Swiss-Prot record:
Protein name per Swiss-Prot or TrEMBL: Accessory Sec system protein translocase subunit SecY2
Cell compartment(s), UniProt: Cell membrane
Lineage, top ranks: Bacteria, Bacillati, Bacillota, Bacilli, Lactobacillales
Gene3D superfamilies linked to this entry: SecY subunit domain
Keyword list, A-Z: Cell membrane, Membrane, Protein transport, Translocation, Transmembrane, Transmembrane helix, Transport
Family the entry assigns: Belongs to the SecY/SEC61-alpha family. SecY2 subfamily.
Coiled-coil segments: none
Function: Part of the accessory SecA2/SecY2 system specifically required for export of possible cell wall proteins. The central subunit of a protein translocation channel.
Amino acid sequence: MTKIYSSIAVKKGLFTLFLLFIYVLGSRIILPFVDLNTKDFLGGSTAYLAFSAALTGGNLRSLSIFSVGLSPWMSAMILWQMFSYSKKLGLSSTAIEIQDRRRMYLTLMIAVIQSLAVSLRLPVQSSYSAILVVLMNTILLIAGTFFLVWLSDLNASMGIGGSIVILLSSMVLNIPQDVLETFQTVHIPTGIIVLLALLTLVFSYLLALMYRARYLVPVNKIGLHNRFKRYSYLEIMLNPAGGMPYMYVMSFLSVPAYLFILLGFIFPNHSGLAALSKEFMIGKPLWVYVYISVLFLFSIIFAFVTMNGEEIADRMKKSGEYIYGIYPGADTSLFINRLVLRFSVIGGLFNVVMAGGPMLFVLFDEKLLRLAMIPGLFMMFGGMIFTIRDEVKALRLNETYKPLI
């Protein structure tokens, strides 16, 4: 028993469970002075925003202080990563502390937009001042977002899984309810349900295959014995981005939806804004095509976030490693980036077919939105499980060695 509790993996796991208890407890703290009987307070975007909030640690159903979730932080990470590719801005050349501070400023700006959009549309109880309630709830929602960011950082340093655990628990708590409500709303024949179950099994197999498949690049390591050289490889995933594109595209596309809600409240009689908001509404052709395009784009972007050729080439050069037939430095970086680009396109096409293809059914019936998002949900869920599994496996690896003395 003492040996079990002395395990690093067990200690980190228990700390993660403690943080999850805090998260679940906070998600039950309801925003004050709000009429909870009104469910469709965000108009036509309620279903999508509630679903996307559940994927990012939020919950627009219970209207708690964690309703917005980690969506502002995730959207800020996407924008920061895009800005970092610009050499003119020079964001990546600044100190780490400055970069973190600027990312938090960007997170705050997005959190203000989303929190204010939600607060302005909240059904406030008539006996209280609407302005004060909106102001107070906006501050509470922003504070809830930053509290979740803090919990994620704590879990990354002292627990297992980082922010993934919070997102995973939110999905487990909220998504099944959304799916069951869809089956109650939309009549689906039994034969179609059986077919969907079979397709789910096939999709799960393909998903595991894509996540575990690796392209091995032989690497020569200085000081490694000749008989071990055949085991020395640089591994590149067949789908380098994994399930991250789907997770972040849901967060990223929710920002314009919140922005349109906010602008619609500020300019209620603006015909151009109303027309644009209507065209970009969830389930409309413009939104579906943008969703599929951004999903493919994020598949490429996050592939390079996961496998950065410059960083890998620099690390190999410093440690005296090199790829057979490739000069160290710039040539190695170019070689790795070409491979990553090639596999990111393959992964992007896989993501578009599996997670983007079902969204085309939404063009015929918007009630199928939640069901159409299930394949992408599987991709996101599978990526999280594999990530946590690999982290636990790495923690337990050090415990397999016995001390010499």
